[in-house]
């Protein structure tokens, strides 16, 4: 996890594509479920929308 990307996300400075990449990295590492609740909810929403996939699943 890159803390600078987290900060950029929280400040609204990431593009939509970069946000999806960030959340996929958080999902793959399991960190999405360890951070504050917003991250897990957002990760689940992105998975449900088909923009991200569950850890271990092919793209």
In which residue ranges do the predicted regions lie?
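Catalytic phosphate/metal-binding cores of nucleic-acid and nucleotide-processing enzymes, i.e., regions
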Residues: 1-59
């Amino acid at each position: 996890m890159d803390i600078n990307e987290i900060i950029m996300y929280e400040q609204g400075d990431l593009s939509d594509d970069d946000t999806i990449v960030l959340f996929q990295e958080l999902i793959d590492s399991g960190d999405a479920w360890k951070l504050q609740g917003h991250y897990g909810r957002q990760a689940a929403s992105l998975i449900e929308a088909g923009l991200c996939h569950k850890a271990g699943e092919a793209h």
